[in-house]
Amino acid sequence: MKLHKITSIAVIMQIKKILATLLFLLLTGYISAQSVGLVLSGGGAKGISHIGVIKALEENEIPIDYIAGTSMGAIIAALYSIGVTPDEMLAMFRSPEFASWYKGEFEKGYATYIYRREPTAEMVGVSLTNEKKNKLGIKLPTSLISPFPMDLAVKQIFASSAAVAGYDFNKLMIPFRCVAADIVNKKPFVLRKGDLSSAVRASMTYPFLFKPIIVDSTLLFDGGLYNNFPWDVMAKDFNPGFIIGSKCSGNAAEPDTEDILSQLENMLRVETDYTIPQEKGVLIDILLPGVSIMDFNKVDEIYRVGYFNTLRYISGIKSSIKRRTTQKEMLKKRMDFRTKTLPLRFADVHIPGSNLNDSEKEFIINTVKNNSSEVFNFEQLKRGFYRVVATENVGSIYPDIKIRKDSLFDVYLQIKKNAPMRLSIGGNISSSSLNQGYLGFQYNRFSKNPWRASADVNIGRFYSGLNLMLRQDIGIKPLWFYEAQFTA
């Protein structure tokens, strides 16, 4: 009996050891497999603080297995997903090129002056269109900032990486998600695949600042309108073991009678849930009370706030996440992905499904390609793109870039013609006798060899005059035209 009892105790002790070992293996297995998702809110220039968050996490070897963002958060998240380092992001946001992108200004060295008219006294101008038969309508601008520099920039940054991933956001260096706003159905639009640059461009399209774009037949605006902090998308799509959220913006403040942007924000935005359940992760709340959405001249100040704010959370994050990713491992991961990307070399230009006729398409394609059939690079594409914009014959032009089987790329241009007529008024109102009035009219005829005619009338006590002008562009390479003017 005594032997049997001792044997039973020994068996129980052995079972306990086995169970303890299994439990230890399960726990260590969970820890080693614990995945981490990073979610970045929108916030305009405040979103630069996310770069500081990423820098602090990387320095402390906190892994980032998935990343998602909205608006400015989508830009930072997408850059990280293709292997751009925090230091490289900072250099980009400090650059004069970035300033031209968000201001809508042509980059120096790319502006085309040969198509520009002589300056006039115009103060206000409206475009007139006859798109509806037998009806003349006014065409108002849809954005305050020219979208062309930003459109080209996102293509240059993201096109090759998207091709490497097979246009699947799960196959980027870091799997990625972003959110735009479907204003027709009034709901968030989650972007999981397709053209990465268009996904980013859609997510940061703040109403009235930037022109909206169409993705998958849906007109999309800034994702912050309906979901400014997509932690729910992160949880649903990736289900990471731990979520780190970086929040640099809140819900819309009370509207101000003197601030039209605050009024629009309250009209358009719905409230976002910024609360990450404690069992799912942690929220890094970054306060930037003196920074507005367009304060991109405060890059270093905003970055430092994000960086040092994150350091306050690091000990808690480390206790929740036992896995570590060394900087050497991150460097290898970046190099493995980035070395697969291809230089942007283009074979052809296409204009699918537009309201342009064949001669108009021919002019645009020849202008972009500089009347050449040879392979061309991104710099040549940019020059040709800006030449087309400078002609004032197109109201919108958005490039899509897709890889071919021969590892070259093709450009697909989404184009809408500009209104053919423009009416301008201006002048000078003075308490003295120096009053001056101006009235102008311009008509553009778009074709393979486009022409335009204009009439400008100035009326005043000291000067009155009439100027008539006719110009036609004949060649592209070399670029030449003829022009006739009459002044009275």
How should these model regions be labeled?
Residues I6, L26, Y30-S32, A68, ...:
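Intrinsically disordered, low-complexity regions enriched in small/polar residues
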Residues E379, G384, A390, S396-A488:
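Gram-negative/organellar outer-membrane beta-barrel architecture
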Residues I9-A10, I18-Y30:
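Sec-dependent N-terminal signal peptides
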Residues S32-T70, A78-Y386, A390-I397, I401-I403, ...:
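Patatin-like phospholipase
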Residues I15-L19, I64:
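Structural motif marking the loop-to-transmembrane transition
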